[in-house]
Amino acid sequence: MDNLSNYLIVSAVLFSIGTIGVLTRKNAIVVFMCIELMLNAVNLTFVAFSRHLGNLDGQIFVFFIMTVAAAEAAVGLALFIAFFNNRESIDIDDANLMKW
């Protein structure tokens, strides 16, 4: 049986875990993984609504989100590598020193 509320609860829990991780962690890679977890929670919501409503619009939109997330991962990891080569650390507090 397809119960929409179960999928939405799981999605909300995943999004909450990702939000807590972004707000509390100081390691840039862990924060990046939490952002990806939040994006996957949104994808789960889109797929759940798409299946519940019986159309494919939500599933097509998920493919666009996954494409943007892949580009974000490539650019984000490249920035982390450049930052690590500069500062020898991937701590979020050290990134604050990059301001003018």
Curated annotation (Swiss-Prot):
Entry keyword set: Cell inner membrane, Cell membrane, Membrane, NAD, Quinone, Translocase, Transmembrane, Transmembrane helix, Transport, Ubiquinone
Reaction(s) catalysed by this chain's protein: a quinone + NADH + 5 H(+)(in) = a quinol + NAD(+) + 4 H(+)(out)
Molecular functions (GO terms): NADH:ubiquinone reductase (non-electrogenic) activity; quinone binding
Keyword Cell inner membrane in record: yes
The keyword Translocase appears for this protein: yes
InterPro entries listed in its UniProt record: NADH_UbQ_OxRdtase_chain4L/K, NUOK/Mnh_C1-like
Protein family per UniProt: Belongs to the complex I subunit 4L family.
PANTHER family documented for this protein: NADH DEHYDROGENASE SUBUNIT 4L-RELATED, NADH-UBIQUINONE OXIDOREDUCTASE SUBUNIT ND4L
UniProt-recorded name of the protein: NADH-quinone oxidoreductase subunit K
Species of provenance: Trichlorobacter lovleyi (strain ATCC BAA-1151 / DSM 17278 / SZ)
Upper classification of the organism: Bacteria, Pseudomonadati, Thermodesulfobacteriota, Desulfuromonadia, Geobacterales
